[in-house]
Amino acid sequence: MLVELEDLGKSYFTEEVETRALRGITLQIERGEYVAIEGPSGCGKSTLLSILGLLDTPTAGRYRLNGRAVEKLSSSERATIRNREIGFIFQNFNLIGDLSIYENVELPLVYRGMTRRERRSRVEEVLERVHMSHRAKHFPMQLSGGEQQRVAVARALAGDPSILLADEPTGNLDTRNGEAVMDLLAELHEYGSTIIMVTHDARFAKHAVRAIGLLDGQLVDERIAASAL
């Protein structure tokens, strides 16, 4: 099992007031699954994704990632796992404007200490996979929103992560480009990628094999795509 959550909770405390962002989350995700976590703004989706991505820690319950008890890891151990095993796709793309598309995708590999030849091979491979090889020498401002999100997906893939976490990946896109990004994620899933996506849009949640509803910090329902039955 790749992801195991047991009675997971997250609370924030301010001036002796407790705000429970997540409560009683129990969930298992196997390697190779495509899961959408769907719910309205403020329901805890981004908090859950931050915990899954080791950017935040729960205040209750247990989280095991690839068999490791996350709550027992040090900050440096979490950072190492995050950098090597988790790919992030953000709503705002988070591309660096002064770097070319090639350089944006290459940057995480530089920090890993890969050789120039290794980096070139990997960058070319992932740009081809997201159909953006022809844009390698361009800069983010020269691309449409849909194209920038494709580059963001390529960057997330570059390190060959165990899991892709997508935070509202269609949030800044029109319907046509949003559907194109959803088609790309479905294609990556067919290649074997494990994908967990949070979205407020039921139309896009339907693209996942499993759609899990989140409301007021709690899991409320789960649906399996008809194609998976």
Short names for language-model regions:
Residues L2-L214:
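ABC family nucleotide-binding domain
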